[in-house]
Design a protein with these regions (language model features):
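N-terminal auxiliary interaction/assembly segments of multi-subunit proteins
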Residues: 1-155
Length: 155
């Protein structure tokens, strides 16, 4: 069992990559809630790191945070984004974090395909948890949650 990256490390990893790829500023805004409810969110996307133990990377955003993320990744105005762009952006964010986490603590794991949570499920049986709330873009008020959870007995 490896120690999960801290919320601050998750934010730093996302910031380094997003600055290089999209010119998008990401800052740490605190820890996000434990668990991954899909309710009251515009979109919640997960990417598994398949192996033992099983890790799940999760990104979620409300309308404002999702639009800011999509705007940065697609180089357009926030009002020109749509639900598909938001989901694509969250999938990309999950893949970015999954690749970084794999290199940090799960080199033998395989990165699974991103998928969207379409109901109000909460991930249960979490052994370890680390989650960061990120401020996205230059406005300072758009937020996206990114988290990693470790599960025992899977993989």
């Amino acid at each position: 069992m490896s120690e999960l990256p801290s919320p601050e490390t998750l934010a730093s990893v996302v910031d380094e990559t997003s600055q290089a790829m999209y010119g998008m500023a990401v800052t740490f805004a605190g820890e996000c809630e434990r668990g991954m409810p899909g309710a009251n969110q515009n979109a919640t996307v997960i990417v598994p790191l398949i192996g033992a133990p099983l890790y799940i990377i999760t990104a979620r955003a409300d309308d404002h945070g999702g639009s800011a993320l999509a705007s940065a990744m697609f180089s357009c105005e926030t009002q020109d984004t749509n639900a598909e762009m938001v989901e694509d952006s969250l999938r990309e964010l999950c893949n970015i974090v999954a690749g970084q986490v794999k290199s940090l603590i799960a080199q033998e794991h395989e990165i699974g395909l991103p998928s969207r949570l379409t109901d109000d499920r909460t991930l249960h049986d979490v052994h370890q948890w680390s989650g960061a709330r990120l401020r996205v873009g230059h406005t300072g008020n758009a937020e996206v949650d990114i988290a990693i959870a470790e599960f025992e007995g899977f993989g």
